[in-house]
């Protein structure tokens, strides 16, 4: 994919026609306290905050209301998700409920096919995305790095896709770099790495490959200092994006001198 593509410029991140000044999205669960979450949001300045409808509807009235107040205080757009859904209809119903509760057409589509790995249901995900798009949703689908799956999601109308780097919460970083780089080369839509990043260097790496944004939760929330880690990731995302725009040198199999040979003795010119 050429550097001349409009997507590869210093312009802000654009998703479904809306622009965002940040290329980092942040999850809202597992933080030590609400105050720590708010401080992490303030430090990271994310484009969006993800929130689970299931988590809030199951929390009870007072706790749920407290969370809504927290989101409002953060003053960051909310991206509701369908976390915990295992069937196509369950995901669609949850998305429709989230639209009413959060008053937004944005939805992070999660359709889980395996409880152990939390791997997406790749067979039903495109159909779920298609139905939601036809219902007026702006769908950001959580998926694997499989090229055929991601292409199918684009074909049904997804204007961005969210492949994982590794299973959710593992913090391993990109486990299949070749597939992820191939995905970037082949798809001309925004790609947001959704899961599996554990270190700021992981985020920097995928941004250097040309990915458009990253979504983080566990890596920040479970850090010893979540606020400092939020800042580290924000800096890493920006550094990786800047490096991609700058155009990195190509790796070589043999050593190349970094100083000129002009003026050195002729017997050294072999």
Where are these regions (language model features)?
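Long, charge-rich, low-complexity intrinsically disordered regions
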Residues: 2-7
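Alpha/beta enzyme core
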Residues: 10-15, 29-48, 61-78, 85-270
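Conserved SET/PR-domain catalytic core that frames the SAM/AdoMet-binding pocket
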Residues: 17-23
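Divalent-cation
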Residues: 26
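Metallocofactor- and cofactor-centric catalytic cores in central/energy metabolism, strongly enriched
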Residues: 52-54
């Amino acid at each position: 994919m050429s550097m001349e593509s409009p997507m590869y410029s210093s312009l802000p991140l654009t998703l479904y026609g809306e622009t965002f000044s940040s290329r980092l999205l942040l999850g809202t669960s597992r933080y030590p306290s609400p105050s720590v979450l708010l401080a992490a949001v303030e430090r990271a300045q994310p484009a969006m905050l993800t929130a689970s409808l299931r988590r809030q509807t199951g929390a009870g009235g007072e706790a749920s209301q407290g969370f809504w107040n927290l989101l409002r205080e953060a003053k960051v757009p909310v991206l509701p998700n369908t976390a915990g859904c295992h069937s196509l209809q369950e995901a669609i119903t949850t998305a429709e409920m989230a639209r009413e509760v959060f008053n937004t057409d944005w939805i992070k589509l999660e359709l889980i096919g395996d409880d152990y790995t939390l791997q997406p249901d790749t067979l039903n995900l495109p159909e779920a995305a298609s139905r939601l798009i036809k219902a007026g949703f702006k769908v950001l689908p959580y998926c694997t790095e499989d090229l055929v799956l991601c292409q199918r999601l684009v074909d049904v109308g997804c204007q961005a896709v969210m492949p994982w780097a590794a299973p959710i919460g593992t913090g391993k970083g990109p486990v299949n770099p070749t597939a992820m780089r191939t995905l970037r080369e082949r798809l001309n839509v925004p790609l947001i790495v959704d899961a599996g990043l554990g270190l700021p260097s992981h985020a920097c790496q995928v941004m250097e490959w040309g990915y458009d944004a990253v979504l983080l939760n566990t890596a920040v929330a479970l850090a010893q200092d979540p606020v400092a880690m939020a800042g580290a990731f924000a800096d890493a995302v920006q550094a990786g994006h800047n490096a991609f725009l700058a155009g990195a040198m190509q790796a070589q199999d043999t050593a190349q001198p970094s100083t000129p040979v002009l003026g050195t003795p002729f017997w050294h010119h072999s």
